[in-house]
């Protein structure tokens, strides 16, 4: 699992938490794979460690825009 702090288009910080995920080639996805990328996600609103976040369960729920 990993938690990423992302910035929405309006400047709002959004916490994104993922389960351990593999990409389409079976490689483990790390924060380096998402760093600096513009993404759209599909997940659920969750509460973890005192913060609301969006939890993503599958790599296919992350759409890369760049």
Model-identified regions with their sequence ranges:
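OB-fold single-stranded nucleic acid-binding module
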Residues: 1-66
